[in-house]
Amino acid sequence: MKFTLTGSGRMGQQVADVINRSGIHEIASILDDRSVVTAESFLGSDAIIDFTVRDAFLQNLPAMLQSGVPVVVGTTGWDDQIESVKRRVIESGSSLLYSANFSLGVNIFLRTVREAARLIAPFDQFDIAFTEHHHTGKADFPSGTALRAAEMILSVNPRKRTIVRELFDDRKITADELQVGALRLGSVFGKHTAYIDSEMDEIVISHNAKNREGFASGAVQTAKWLAARHTASPGFYTMDDFLNEMLA
């Protein structure tokens, strides 16, 4: 497969390294913040992998969709535009797969957290909270992965109804609120933890990324999957769609 990469930051460089070391894939082009992006920028590509920033992704989206090349997006921070993006993808007849985190380990972790949140739902003595820890260069907080985890918890645990990102002064959290804490420190690639607590027990479920290769490898793997189904089944996809098919 031939890939066009949009974004030449740390994740873009890691994806390029995975592709170059694969022995079977190649890079058609790399577009950075100095590139003028048009539909023609993606000619000769089998898939696009986007790791940029919110504004760049939204600005480049029309050209990517117009090109007809399937797009895998790891850029985060645009969740408020997700319904608009879904609509544009469907109207274009193209394909886009979005995930805040392409690590297979993280996605297995997320499903484990969701199942744990479902299991404790009938038992009032158990409470649940979530934290994430990333390097100081990460711009968005809480991370897209943490917010995805929070949404999954809320979807299966009716005792939690809203997400609280920060607590100020003497404000106390209420029983129906799910706290999602964020820490920016050092050079941590990414650590996500769910805490389940009662007066009698504590359950801790955690995922700690050792490097960025897991994210990059997952992005390449999902791009292959998306390209294979793009012609017959275009549309908007998530990591759940990929995993559901792989685990079927």
Swiss-Prot record:
SUPFAM superfamilies: Glyceraldehyde-3-phosphate dehydrogenase-like, C-terminal domain, NAD(P)-binding Rossmann-fold domains. It comes from the Bacteria. Gene3D superfamilies: Dihydrodipicolinate Reductase, domain 2, NAD(P)-binding Rossmann-like Domain. It is an enzyme of class 1 (oxidoreductase). It catalyses: (S)-2,3,4,5-tetrahydrodipicolinate + NAD(+) + H2O = (2S,4S)-4-hydroxy-2,3,4,5-tetrahydrodipicolinate + NADH + H(+); (S)-2,3,4,5-tetrahydrodipicolinate + NADP(+) + H2O = (2S,4S)-4-hydroxy-2,3,4,5-tetrahydrodipicolinate + NADPH + H(+). Pathway: Amino-acid biosynthesis; L-lysine biosynthesis via DAP pathway; (S)-tetrahydrodipicolinate from L-aspartate: step 4/4. GO terms for molecular function: 4-hydroxy-tetrahydrodipicolinate reductase; NAD binding; NADP binding; oxidoreductase activity, acting on CH or CH2 groups, NAD or NADP as acceptor. InterPro entries: DapB_C (IPR022663), DapB_N (IPR000846), DHDPR_bac (IPR023940), NAD(P)-bd_dom_sf (IPR036291). GO terms for biological process: diaminopimelate biosynthetic process; lysine biosynthetic process via diaminopimelate. The keyword Cytoplasm applies. The active site is at residues 134, 138. (S)-2,3,4,5-tetrahydrodipicolinate binds at residues 135, 144-145. Keywords: Amino-acid biosynthesis, Cytoplasm, Diaminopimelate biosynthesis, Lysine biosynthesis, NAD, NADP, Oxidoreductase. Disulfide bonds: none annotated. NAD(+) binds at residues 32, 74-76, 99-102. Its EC number is 1.17.1.8. NCBIfam families: dapB. Catalyzes the conversion of 4-hydroxy-tetrahydrodipicolinate (HTPA) to tetrahydrodipicolinate. Belongs to the DapB family. This is 4-hydroxy-tetrahydrodipicolinate reductase. It comes from Chlorobium limicola (strain DSM 245 / NBRC 103803 / 6330). The lineage of its organism: Bacteria, Pseudomonadati, Chlorobiota, Chlorobiia, Chlorobiales.
